[in-house]
């Protein structure tokens, strides 16, 4: 047996992956206190002790058109990671999300005798379904946080473990709205809207103006409307402030550093980009509207590739439309405001929606960090 510590390679490509990676590292450190973690990491993973060869922001690119502009740099990083991990020979490599980057990297490393895990499943059930064969060749195991994903992989005999979602473990089934409001300085009886224009720079650039103009329309209906805008880091905050100064300079908003969860729990309704934020909003039991816009060519291509009728995780989990989705040309202030207005009403329909959110929460509350850590350790080969 080697005297070196258990060594885990990790690559996370965006904020949601950073959160998952940090939880996995915490759970592994509890089981193997001396373990070493190295790769591409965001601030949360680095805070847990992951050595970063590259910053996560290097990989955080959205859309096909946008990726093309960064392709030479991304390919150079992947070549370098392949070489460095192959030399290091970690006990296990875990690619966290970022499938277009990580799955090829996982395949490269598997060819060098390294056991690989992909965490979490890309949306192969929704589009580019033939990727399942590449994933099967590139990985020893897929970790999935949605129950229907494992059933999809089982059809193709690709090893997959349903572990639930870390956010479902971390959030209470019945969040305390008044405590969240007190934390954020929001009056108990005020109407409150959360705006979440995304974690990536391209999303914030594309969505902020429409989201701000929607808030302007809603304040005409609710003069007491409090608007909270959680932003993932200082870059996104500066970007949002720049857009706001030209679009809605007189609109009073609460800009928050992080605190997305508190903002969702405190709010009567949320307007957000699709992605992990929609799942978090569901777990916060906050009614929402999803608004999303891409570059025209990227959207044109997505329309032809996507195999599901919805893009947001609450709708996909429920198998029906719980949440209004307004995409591309439908993502306008008038339409967004019209969809948000009913969410502020204290009606039986809204109570029923929150009950459904609780039911879905329970389905994916499975102690995911612990399960993911156990899956990693089961793949460790004695040296």
From Swiss-Prot:
The keyword Lipid biosynthesis applies. CDD domains: Glycosyltransferase_GTB-type (cd01635). Pfam families: LpxB. It catalyses: 2-N,3-O-bis[(3R)-3-hydroxytetradecanoyl]-alpha-D-glucosaminyl 1-phosphate + UDP-2-N,3-O-bis[(3R)-3-hydroxytetradecanoyl]-alpha-D-glucosamine = lipid A disaccharide (E. coli) + UDP + H(+); a lipid X + a UDP-2-N,3-O-bis[(3R)-3-hydroxyacyl]-alpha-D-glucosamine = a lipid A disaccharide + UDP + H(+). Its EC number is 2.4.1.182. GO terms for biological process: lipid A biosynthetic process. Pathway: Glycolipid biosynthesis; lipid IV(A) biosynthesis; lipid IV(A) from (3R)-3-hydroxytetradecanoyl-[acyl-carrier-protein] and UDP-N-acetyl-alpha-D-glucosamine: step 5/6. GO terms for molecular function: lipid-A-disaccharide synthase activity; phospholipid binding. Keywords: Glycosyltransferase, Lipid A biosynthesis, Lipid biosynthesis, Lipid metabolism, Transferase. One of its GO terms (cellular component) is membrane. InterPro entries: Glyco_trans_19. Condensation of UDP-2,3-diacylglucosamine and 2,3-diacylglucosamine-1-phosphate to form lipid A disaccharide, a precursor of lipid A, a phosphorylated glycolipid that anchors the lipopolysaccharide to the outer membrane of the cell. NCBIfam families: lpxB (TIGR00215). Belongs to the LpxB family. This is Lipid-A-disaccharide synthase. It comes from Pectobacterium atrosepticum (strain SCRI 1043 / ATCC BAA-672) (Erwinia carotovora subsp. atroseptica). The gene is lpxB.
């Amino acid at each position: 047996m080697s005297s070196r510590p258990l060594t885990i390679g990790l690559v996370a490509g965006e904020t949601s992956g950073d959160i998952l990676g940090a939880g996995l590292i915490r759970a592994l450190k509890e089981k193997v206190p001396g373990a070493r973690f190295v790769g591409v990491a965001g601030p949360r993973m680095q805070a847990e002790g992951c050595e970063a060869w590259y910053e996560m922001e290097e990989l955080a690119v959205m859309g096909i058109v946008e990726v093309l502009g960064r392709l030479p740099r991304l390919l150079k990083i992947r070549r370098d990671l392949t070489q460095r991990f192959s030399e290091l020979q970690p006990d296990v490599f875990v690619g966290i999300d970022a499938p277009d980057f990580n799955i090829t990297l996982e395949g490269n490393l598997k060819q060098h005798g390294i056991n690989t895990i992909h965490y979490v499943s890309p949306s192969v059930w929704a589009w580019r379904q033939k990727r399942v064969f590449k994933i099967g060749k590139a990985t020893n195991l897929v970790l999935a946080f949605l129950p229907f994903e494992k059933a999809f992989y089982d059809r193709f005999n690709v090893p997959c473990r349903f572990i639930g979602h870390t956010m479902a473990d971390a959030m209470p089934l019945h969040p305390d709205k008044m405590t969240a409001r007190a934390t954020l300085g929001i009056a108990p009886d005020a109407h409150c809207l959360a705006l979440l224009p995304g974690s990536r720079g391209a999303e914030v650039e594309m969505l902020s103006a429409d989201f701000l103009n929607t808030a302007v329309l809603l304040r005409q209906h609710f003069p007491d409307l409090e608007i909270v805008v959680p932003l993932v880091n200082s870059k996104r905050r500066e970007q949002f402030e720049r857009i706001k100064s030209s679009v809605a300079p007189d609109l009073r908003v609460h800009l928050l550093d992080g605190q997305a969860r508190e903002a969702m729990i405190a709010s009567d309704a949320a307007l957000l980009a699709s992605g992990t934020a929609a799942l978090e909003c569901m777990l916060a039991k906050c009614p929402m509207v999803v608004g999303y816009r891409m570059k025209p060519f990227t959207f044109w291509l997505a329309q032809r590739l996507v195999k599901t009728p919805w893009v947001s995780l609450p709708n996909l989990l429920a198998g029906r439309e719980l949440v209004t989705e307004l995409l591309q040309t439908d993502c306008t202030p008038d339409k967004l405001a019209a969809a948000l207005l009913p969410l502020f009403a204290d009606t039986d329909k809204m109570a029923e929606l929150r009950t459904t959110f609780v039911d879905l929460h329970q389905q994916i509350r499975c102690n995911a960090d612990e399960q993911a850590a156990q899956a990693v350790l089961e793949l460790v080969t004695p040296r």
